[in-house]
Amino acid sequence: MLFSWREDPGAQCLLLSLLLLAASEVGSGQLHYSVSEEAKHGTFVGRIAQDLGLELAELVPRLFRVASKRHGDLLEVNLQNGILFVNSRIDREELCGRSAECSIHLEVIVDRPLQVFHVEVEVKDINDNAPVFPMAVKNLFISESRQPGSRFSLEGASDADIGTNSLLTYSLDSTEYFTLDVKRNDEEIKSLGLVLKKNLNREDTPKHYLLITAIDGGKPELTGTTQLKITVLDVNDNAPAFERTIYKVRLLENAPNGTLVVTVNATDLDEGVNKDIAYSFNTDMSADILSKFHLDPVNGQISVKGNIDFEESKSYEIQVEATDKGNPPMSDHCTVLLEIVDINDNVPELVIQSLSLPVLEDSPLSTVIALISVSDRDSGVNGQVTCSLTPHVPFKLVSTFKNYYSLVLDSPLDRESVSAYELVVTARDGGSPSLWATASVSVEVADVNDNAPAFSQSEYTVFVKENNPPGCHIFTVSARDADAQENALVSYSLVERRVGERALSSYVSVHAESGKVYALQPLDHEELELLQFQVSARDAGVPPLGSNVTLQVFVLDENDNAPALLMPRVGGIGGAVSELVPRSVGAGHVVAKVRAVDADSGYNAWLSYELQPGTGGARIPFRVGLYTGEISTTRALDEVDAPRHRLLVLVKDHGEPSLTATATVLVSLVESGQAPKASSQASAGATGPEAALVDVNVYLIVAICAVSSLLVLTLLLYTALRCSAPPTEGDCGPGKPTLVCSSAVGSWSYSQQRQQRVCSGEGLPKTDLMAFSPSLPPCPISRDREEKQDVDVDLSAKPRQPNPDWRYSASLRAGMHSSVHLEEAGILRAGPGGPDQQWPTVSSATPEPEAGEVSPPVGAGVNSNSWTFKYGPGNPKQSGPGELPDKFIIPGSPAIISIRQEPTNSQIDKSDFITFGKKEETKKKKKKKKGNKTQEKKEKGNSTTDNSDQ
């Protein structure tokens, strides 16, 4: 900053005060500097960076910049040394006019973090303007009759400077007739007048030329001059006189045209023409006043004829002259001081500078979004402006300085709820009525990855038919991410795990983009009934977010397995079964039983038996049970019947379409006396190869006993641990519930293999009897221990190890070699609700204590893992391993599972095919003396119980 009065002690004190004031203002956010007008380019103003507490090295990185509402190029900051200097010519008179205070307001903005500083630079006046008179030559007419002491008003000079630089003094050339008179009134208005010192004599000197000099109070002094050309007139010796020298008037701005301002009045003591007065504006009046006001020359009324704006000019000084019509004319002057009263006619102005757009939705609170400055050209209360913001938005306005606001974040943002805000900033002044202005700010919320992909369900259930083609589309998963752009791009993948011995990815795959799930290979219901796995959805954000969904794929059964016949090991030719039947049997005698199994489930495994008609349409005396497979006689046999019958039994399931198998049974009709011999020969022929296997059977028995002993020890240890351990959550593994699902067909199963397949965990399954109700949903059941006890049969209900007396007898082995061990497949009962399919699980033996057998269950989904045993002759009647009660009802299913107890006198044998053993031959020898009738009755009775030797 330049000072020409550096040596002055008072100036040094003033400078020190200014520096202390500037230092104190740094803490409050505003600095004060001063600079003289007309300073040269590069003139030092202040060390702004140092005063603001900023390091020079951070000016450029923090984007140090200076902003100003007006005259932004007058001052500039050197970013290398942080000095504020003069950039262009500063003219105080052009910048502030005749205002007593003149300052340049600057805004200094730095980023990272955003800070705003306010700097006020005071522009000091220098004496650079000389006094100026309105006219270079002033013509003045003075009558020679004017008396000494008469005063003639003159227009004084004006100086554009202020303060002492504008204080003017006047001087007049030396003359004996005139002197200058300068008066100062209460309004600090200097009245310049020319006073006549002695009488004029027009005849001596008709004209006088005077030079008036105006000198200002600056250093150095500047002067201005004007020349007075005085013409001496004769006659009219009374000039008009105004009632008041000064008129003070107040006028509202924006007054309409024609509004009366004031009426001036002057009187003249002369008479006649010399008394007539005409009013006019002084010839020195500015063009601006002449354009805004009108003066009636006759009545002296001043009225408005232009726009009166307080913001343009707060007051007007109007010079009015009254001139009579004498010769020469005489005049008088008065001054009208017009004060303009401000009204609230200017709306506030808003300037918004956006700094941080768009705004991240995770931005911290109090983040500065934009800077807002307001102004109002009105004064007083009319110029006091307050700002407000649209309600119910997560932003607020914070006043940082007078008429300056910051738009800051007030509450957390969520782009998924609102992606953009249209804010309206309202600036309202304090006038009555108040005026306001609005400005819109569009705030866009930028997305961050704060939402994970979400599935519409936590679990999906899918039904797929088995034998699907490889690559078959079975389902489509879809997850939605509430984020935008890359944060919403979802990719899908499998959550890999093991399914038995194979990886999950060998069964199914999922398309990464579409979420389509494909079966990579044909699924087999008999191998896998339920495939449970998880699909993961993950977005492309940083860091990525994800979620999982569970898919339960139920493999529905198709009729893809034909019935399989359980054929005997010996007897028959080319796979056919041979049976010998005495001709003496009556109607209903069971000749043989055909047994078959189907690997499918439900109706696809429900088997029925049909006897194909004989060749040539001949009627045969045999029939087959529709659901039992038992071949029995339809009538008593006689001599006319052919000795050999080839029976074709068609076994078919109830699938769509049904699959079939054919069993061939060769029935030979023999006389009653020949049947025991044939049976004996067959038994003798079977013992030959059986003897060759004795050694092998010994090893097998030893191995079976060892394995059984190990199994018993394991079960005992497991039972002891389970009784002492706390209850677990489920049977399929820790934390994994047993999955109980209802099938569309069938309502129960008894299968160790099936129980293992529906478990999604890796734990060992139990061999339980599980009853399924169609009302059960196809989803995992509760892990509650009480509910599990209602579904699973307790381990204590498992069958015990077979009694050591349960062994294969020689007759039983012979019977097994000579016949097909089959079991009834079911009994169709007609009830009130229609026929019910009964799936027997274990068949009871004859009620006698010395005979009994258990055959493998045949029905829906039952495999051929079955066994047969015989009660020892000395044991009482008891339930064998795996036998069920006579009848039990499965809740929710119409099926009634029963074990059919045959009557004592029933002729239906439980052996697969009827043979005549040695026991009948022995009885006939002992009763040789009896009649043929008694012998025939014995033969019939022995035929029904002969399976005890088998």
Curated annotation (Swiss-Prot):
Topological domains annotated Cytoplasmic: 719-950
A molecular function GO annotation: calcium ion binding
Compositionally biased intervals (Basic and acidic residues): 782-797, 909-923
Entry's Gene Ontology cellular component terms: plasma membrane
Ranges occupied by PXXP repeats: 734-737, 774-777, 799-802, 832-835, 873-876, 891-894
UniProt entry tagged with the keyword Nucleotidyltransferase: no
Main subcellular localisation: membrane
Endpoints of the signal sequence: 1-29
Region (6 X 4 AA repeats of P-X-X-P): 734-894
Protein name according to UniProt: Protocadherin alpha-3
Organism: Homo sapiens
